[in-house]
């Protein structure tokens, strides 16, 4: 695996695209599982407890690594390991999220806002100390609308954002040996589109008669497709359904809203200081110490990630200088 110049994220994205080709894996592509890795690494955030989220790459350690909801994600992590080893200057947390947005773009989806600055927990002890137990926070496909709102509402997402994010089911498939469910949602599960919403609205879905958990099925273009109870809840709920209909009718609208919602998702838990790096606010508060801001704010140089100039870089989690420039003066470790 090739190494790239430190901070050259565009070159790194090209390397990520290369490792997406996995002939021996699902449908020949690692793309969908890379998106799932970014999603699950971020989707355990809590606004109430203010923990979880993409910072730290906590899934490298228990309890996240053994959370049943994360079953199968070791494939995504292993696909990225050679790239991580060749480019140790990037944190796991940044690489996982960058891989997710790169995969979406490479599979025909929208460009997702992304910026570096996430840090890695150095040990299981550090992960537990700063993150706590964030298990049982991801969606359960067997449940309904109330559960979906509870899970996504904990992260601060609206009904519209919930439906937009559900469009990630355009990608990949379920596995009986992981979630218990089985099959893809769409005919081409390695191409990002609004096909999921179009199929969801078609009156073709019937309960599958099998030994696994309850799910729906339909045969489309000779392919057995499936929908989960959480998917069907989107057309049964009077607030969710209008957004399903809008996204089925307008792929450009879906792409725009998905990009905004996914960009928000991968920033959850990334509490940045004015250098652009995630900070250990909890640790600093507990120890009564000031936050570590050893790198000076960027001046008038151009950020190689966003193209913004120096202190003009704006983020979902707050403003500050370019995180890449700050990276030159600070070790990306917690």
UniProtKB/Swiss-Prot annotation:
Gene3D superfamilies tied to this protein: 1.10.520.10, Peroxidase, domain 2
Q: Which GO terms describe its molecular function?
A: heme binding; metal ion binding; peroxidase activity
Q: Report the cofactor remark.
A: Binds 1 heme b (iron(II)-protoporphyrin IX) group per subunit.
Q: Which domain of life is it from?
A: Eukaryota
Q: Which InterPro entries match?
A: Ccp1-like, Haem_peroxidase, Haem_peroxidase_sf, Peroxidase_I, Peroxidases_AS
How would you classify this enzyme at the top EC level? oxidoreductase
Q: Which Pfam families match?
A: peroxidase
* Keyword line: Heme, Iron, Metal-binding, Oxidoreductase, Peroxidase
Which Gene Ontology BP annotations are present?
Answer: cellular response to oxidative stress; hydrogen peroxide catabolic process; response to reactive oxygen species
Q: Where is this site: Transition state stabilizer?
A: 36
The EC number on file is 1.11.1.-
**Cofactor field:** heme b
Catalytic site residues?
A: 40, 185
Positions contributing to heme b binding? 169
Q: Does the keyword Oxidoreductase apply?
A: yes
General function of this protein: Destroys radicals which are normally produced within the cells and which are toxic to biological systems.
Q: What is this protein called?
A: Putative heme-binding peroxidase
